[in-house]
Every structure is written in structure tokens, then in C-alpha cells.
Amino acid sequence: MSKIIGIDLGTTNSAVAVLEGTESKIIANPEGNRTTPSVVSFKNGEIIVGDAAKRQAVTNPETVISIKSKMGTSEKVSANGKEYTPQEISAMILQYLKGYAEDYLGEKVEKAVITVPAYFNDAQRQATKDAGKIAGLEVERIVNEPTAAALAYGMDKTDKDEKILVFDLGGGTFDVSILELGDGVFDVLATAGDNKLGGDDFDQKIIDFLVAEFKKENGIDLSQDKMALQRLKDAAEKAKKDLSGVTQTQISLPFITAGSAGPLHLEMSLSRAKFDDLTRDLVERTKTPVRQALSDAGLSLSEIDEVILVGGSTRIPAVVEAVKAETGKEPNKSVNPDEVVAMGAAIQGGVITGDVKDVVLLDVTPLSLGIETMGGVFTKLIDRNTTIPTSKSQVFSTAADNQPAVDIHVLQGERPMAADNKTLGRFQLTDIPAAPRGIPQIEVTFDIDKNGIVSVKAKDLGTQKEQHIVIKSNDGLSEEEIDRMMKDAEANAEADAKRKEEVDLKNEVDQAIFATEKTIKETEGKGFDTERDAAQSALDELKAAQESGNLDDMKAKLEALNEKAQALAVKMYEQAVAAQQAAQGAEGAQANDSANNDDVVDGEFTEK
């Protein structure tokens, strides 16, 4: 089998690795660098990728950076006189990585394992897979970045049982995963994250500071000058990196713009203390996902054996100190944070080809999945942090008599009401035979494959007719939305519970009215008029309460109706039992007569 390369398709930088024997090796790019900037530029119809594209970003406005942040959305970028989807731009980066991997290996590369942030949703994962296809790669597996990092870290520790926390702060995303390692099994216990937090945000804080200081001194807003802004971005990134090794750095940008008196220059010094102050809120945001992942995994900090740092942004001293303070542990520095994800992806490629033996990777889905049910309730079928691949089915029914079709509204999120979660897709199951509500049996099945990509099937168990959909959303879940889902779920827990209680009560009332009306109709002319009249009276009162919308009144009248309906049901049961006993008595008498007749024997009498 041909080699399967491992690719870390990052926001700011990407890397490619391959398994050589039992070792995972990073492949250097044509410029000798072990990581490649995730930058694409267009010049005179030529596509330029990587270091060369990044170098000309200041002077070439047709340069695309951080395209990963747009994956899974319908947003396009304009360049080279065309409009490109995020998948197409990402494919250009993948093609470049594939090309120099082929040069190194001396053979054609057709298959890859590509990593994504653990908190990437279905649309973003599908977009990544599509980008691979456009680049001419068969994507054998989509692997979560922290999981790939754990795979690379733990490959030489398969005889050791330990629980690790992977802290992955990259250029545009942040993930935390808790894994249990032992006997070659890499089991993800929980994952959490913030898809709108990364090194780019730290750069932006410096840019905003420089723009504000320059405006204060010169009265000119550099953020309105596209070329000046690109120079500021480059300077901010360099300053951030410098401050990981020194306590102060000088930012010098001559001829940044021109004023009425002539050219203006930006000269400023930035201390690590000032940088820490500017980015304090970003560092603070890393703490919540750490706590969330630990809580979901059901572990305390004392049960974590190692903390692994992944992503270039974990070199920021304030981030390292925050990790120490939050976990109470010195981070393990045995892996290269820029390379470990691609190396883990290559190891997974080796698992697929059979070159790596006795390794099992058990990943999870980051958010709950389900459908909208009556009253706008979000009914979960698969909970977050469920090991994938997985499949779950549940039977639902119709909400009205003779309902010919059901709409299946597929959602992703953590809130109890459908409106507060993210729509992944909708489809319809039609031609349901006419029947009273609650009679048709509609089985809804969710499947999540090994790549975390969702497919949903609805089947009428009566007719065996089914509809199937692979979720392909054009506007995937944004980073803010994922973060908001988790935070809103906590902040609005009380309000959510109340709203759900209201919907549940209304559904219960609706069901009770339907069932009681049916019982009253079925018992017409069968006696026990007293109980029927009492049930009818309670039914009328509940309908009036339902009309008024008063929840307390509805609750009280529902209890009263249940009591009267129960009394009617008891009478029906007693009548049925009496009828059954009477029937059994009649059968018994008939059997006795037959038995008595059997005792009579005809015989001859002889007189002596």
C-alpha cells in the first residue's frame, strides 16, 4: 500500500509528515522549513503558496491568510479576478504540501490523514474533506488535532497507563482534550474549546495598541491603510515571537505613512509586561475550556498525569504560566508544539496501512446532536463527548391525526430548546398513511462516522419508506456560535429549564385531552354515566385552562382530569374483568355438563 501522509492544516502554519519505519518524520518544504505558512497569493495569474506568499503579503493585496477560519461557511474571497471558496484556497495549500511530500518520497501521494480542531463542526469537517479532494487527495481520516498530538506523544509509551490533558492553542483555534492512554488504546474522554481564540488574536491586540498609539501621536488612523495594516500584522507577529524569549522588543516601521509634513515612521518599544496586560483577557479565556473538559471527563486535576502543550501560541510565557496555575503541573515539553500534530496524523496513517500495530484511537463528537420535537424542544439522540463512530436510533410519531409527512429538523448544540441551537439541515419524510396521531412509528437514526461527519435517516416502520441525508451545510457553525452554545447553556440553565417545563406541561395537557376524548367516545352507551360525566366536566375545565394559558391553572386542572379519567378507566377495567369471568364461568359449566355425560356407561343387564 502507498504511503499515507499526515497533514496539519493550520490557521497560520501547516505541516506534513510521513511514517518511516516506526518513526514519524516531518518533511521540510523546498525552503528547508519544517512548517509552511498557510498563505496563498496571486500574481500575474500565478498561484504562490507558503513562505514566498507570506513574504510578498505586504506589497501584494491579492494575498489570502487565515482561510481556515472561513471553512464550513459560504463566505468567498476575491482574488486574481475570481471568487474562491475556503475549500479551494485550502486545497491550494494542501496541493503544495502534497507536492513537496512527493518530491521527498520520490513517489506519487494519493492519500492523507488531515487534522482539524476538536471543536470543528460537521460543516467544517466536510469542508476540510472536500479541500483534500480538490487537492487530489483521498482523505482516509479526519483526526482531531489534540488527539493526533496525544498519538505522537504516547507512541513510545504504550506500556504505560496515564491520563493526559492536551492544551492546544494554535493560530486561530483553541482546544483542550482529556485522554486516557494504555495498552495501545488512545481513548478521548472529553473535549472542549474556543474556536475564536488563537495566536491571531494575540497579534491583533498588538496591532490595536500600535494603531491607537500612532493615532494619538500623529492623528492618523493606520487601520484604514491596507498596506500599512499588513506591515503592522507582520511586525506584531514578530514582536509576539520576540517577547517569548526577551522581556522587551523594538518595533520599527519606517515610512509607514505620510502626513502633511512628509513621511511618518513608527518607532515603538513593547515590553513583555505590556504585552501580558494587553492580552490578559485572551489568556483568561483559556481557563473555562480546561475546567469544562475536566468536568465532562469526570476527573480532578490530581488525576491528570501529564499536560501536553500543542500549537505555537503555547510558547507565550503568560500562557505557560496560566496552564501551570490552572493545572498545578509543569507542562511536559517532550514534544515540538509546531510539529506534533502532523506527526500524530502520520502515525494514524500508519495505523490505517497496517504499518503501526496494536494502536486503537477512540475519538469523540464535540457537541450533542438531535432533532426538533413537538413544542420546539431539542431532543438529543447523541450526547457530546460520545465515542465515534457511533449510531443511535429513536422512534417518534406524528403530532396530528392523518398527518401525511414529518419534517426532520437536525440540530447541533447543548440548549434544551431547538431555536437556541444550530441547524445542520432539514428534510422531509412523506407519504405517511392516514392514521390517528401517535400511531405511525417514525424511526430516526443518527450516524457519525470516524471523521465526525453526520448522516441522518428517517424511516416509516409501517411502510418501510425512508429518507436519508448527509449533512452538508453551506454556512457551518461559526466559532462564536460554538462558544456561545456552551456559555449560554450554563448562563441560561434556569430559564431554559422553565421554558422546557412549560412546553412539557402543554404537551402533557394536549395528550391528556386527546386520550380522554377518545375514552369518552369509546365508552358511550356502555354504562357508568356518572364517571363519564365527571371526566367530561374535568375535560371541559382543562380545555378552558388551556385556552387561558395560565400554567398553574392548567397544572391543577390536569391533575383533576387525570383523577376523573382514572376513575373511568377503573370502571372500564372492572366491566372487562366481570365480562371475562362470566365468559369463563359459562365455559366451565359447559365443560362440567360434558364431563357428567362422559361418566354414563351403557351396559347389558342379564337376569338370573
Curated annotation (Swiss-Prot):
Residues 580-608 are annotated as: Disordered. Belongs to the heat shock protein 70 family. This is Chaperone protein DnaK. The keyword Chaperone applies. Gene3D superfamilies: 1.20.1270.10, 3.30.420.40, Actin, Chain A, domain 4, Substrate Binding Domain Of DNAk, Chain A, domain 1. Coiled coil: none annotated. It comes from the Bacteria. Acts as a chaperone. The modification Phosphothreonine is found at residue 173. The keyword Nucleotide-binding applies. Residues 580-598 have a biased composition (Low complexity). Keywords: ATP-binding, Chaperone, Nucleotide-binding, Phosphoprotein, Stress response. Pfam families: HSP70.
